[in-house]
Amino acid sequence: MRARTLLVAWAMLAPLGGQVRAGPAGPAALPPVIAPAALGKPSFDETFTQFDAGVDQTRPARPHRWRTVLGNGGPAAAANRTISGMSLGVDRDFHGADNGAPVGIDPFSTGPQGLTITARKVDAVTQVRLFGRQWASGQVTTKFSFEQLYGYFEAEMDLPVCQKGAWPAFWLVPAKGPWPLHGEIDAPETIGDGKVYWTAITREAGRRDQQHITTPGDCTRRWHRYGVLWRPDSIGYYYDGHLVGQVRTPADYVEPMYMILDLGVGGSWPGPPDPAATQITMRVRRVTAWPLPR
């Protein structure tokens, strides 16, 4: 990232229709606009012309670029694949809660428009194999393949912002320590109510707390760029390259983070989907990260 990009026009834009709950000290001003073409060479760039994904329960000698499990509780644990209270992250190699034959549901597909994650409602028999979850969906992470301390992270996505019960997310979590010991950045997530939620979760005060910003979403299923600029002093959230809000960087944000893309369905926050719904999708055209200028 070139220094001049971050040193021009530092005046902060107020969140566009947003609501802010920030920490005790105000964050330093961030650039109102970020243009990816001016950021220099990225540290990570994925356009999904190939989809290098696999389970990678533990770190292999040659990790896949995208990991399809969370790594919580071991390979046979529900927590290893849980996305929400109603949905489980599966892949073509998932053998079910009974560790039997492959369940046979692949939520991932690629094409000219990048990666599509499709959540599917399953029948009662399949629910048993999904630890009781009603929906089979997907999640991918860069754990083992990419992590970074500070920088600008961006995903170009088509999200079901206004589809009831849909819970897609692009987020960052630390590579070390139990969640959320060193924080979590949601950049962003949506829950089907037409809003976009940007959140920094922290335990810097010895308890789980969050700095939260809400902005309007787009219900037309168009492509948008969702980004987060993470600096030692400030975190800024960007929608199509424009700053929509910022918060102070919590003191416990000291470890490199890796990226997660997932599509949850239902749960206590978004609520259940429409009973008639059988399929929900999110599309991701590009995921890119740049380091901070030295």
Predicted regions and their residues:
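GH16 jelly-roll
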Residues: 23-294
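Bacterial N-terminal signal peptides
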Residues: 8-15
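Bacterial N-terminal signal peptides that target proteins for export
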Residues: 1-7
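Boundary at the C-terminal end of the N-terminal hydrophobic targeting segment
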Residues: 18-22
